[in-house]
């Protein structure tokens, strides 16, 4: 495969510094995982803060998370400075600059760079087949995690929601909400921190360990799988994959921003500075981004699976081959120009120019033969697309929007601990999961 001058410079730089860059890349990925594990463990012991007693284990895990988060930012900065030495990586500086502030974006940068280093000398056609299999496995993993999340969440919430709805009739429930609001708003922060039986009605339903296993871990797993999908799509860099790539980019940025704001609100403003109740409300509003991020990741994975299992993947491969052909033409044009200049000074180079022309002609015919062969093979071997119409995808997006609206309503009820009305979000999530596997 011929490369343009800039691509050749990039490849030479990565080949020369491969082991050096891999060391920092693997270090950033390990720090990310330690950062996530620390956050998960800190979240599982979070109850101690609200009960008025500082849990030393919780405090240690938050400190570890802070240390590993800073390490991720530091290593991302080192990688940025390393790549900046090569002019062909100037376009990546914006992404690495964002990664300095947002750990999830830094993780995506590291995954992308590791892919570049791992597949330096691979043939493009074979490489695309490997990536196709990776994308299929990742999207199927997203489906499975989403399904497990919906089933477990429904099994936890449904019995308790039915029990509470049997206790409170709807008119009485509305009156109870108004009474609770009138009690909370005058001095909401003291009320929440002082009345653990009310504030932790949620934890009476779901203890800390099930909350960790059934909610935190699936959420982080799903968003992390989205990071891997983002890295592979960015590595392919195809115009036909721009929509899922843009969606995943927005998801990553939203979860990064929400994570930082939530950290500030929970650890600094709400706990240590004893701020008004409005901060607590903002905290619950921010948490709505997580369901949105999970839905965005899920819908993006559907789009990706559709493309890699249909004839659209053929178009992506042809696009990549056309880019390769264009690069060949550019290189041959540059080489021909050099040879023509040399011919003016040395007539003996005429034979070399003829040989180059013959090589160029044979290379072009070989490329066309591969393209036609690829098109013929793809028409025979590629399976029929499971999405013959847009009906299934429309239903999934429609149900996702409805579930997000219900989650918004339900989060208010959860924060006031009156009724677990967010159960429709999980039920509809299960319906989405069911429709997805039927359509595959």
UniProtKB/Swiss-Prot annotation:
Membrane topology: Multi-pass membrane protein
Family in the record: To M.pneumoniae MPN_087.
Keyword Cell membrane attributed: yes
Chief place of localization: membrane
Source organism per UniProt: Mycoplasma pneumoniae (strain ATCC 29342 / M129 / Subtype 1)
Compartments in which it is found: Cell membrane
Chain segments annotated as coiled-coil in the UniProt record: none
This protein's record includes keyword Transmembrane helix: yes
Protein name: Uncharacterized protein MPN_085
Superkingdom of origin organism: Bacteria
GO terms under cellular component: plasma membrane
Residue stretches spanning the membrane: 26-46, 59-79, 96-116, 138-158, 211-231, 241-261, 263-283, 284-304, 394-414, 418-438
Keywords: Cell membrane, Membrane, Transmembrane, Transmembrane helix
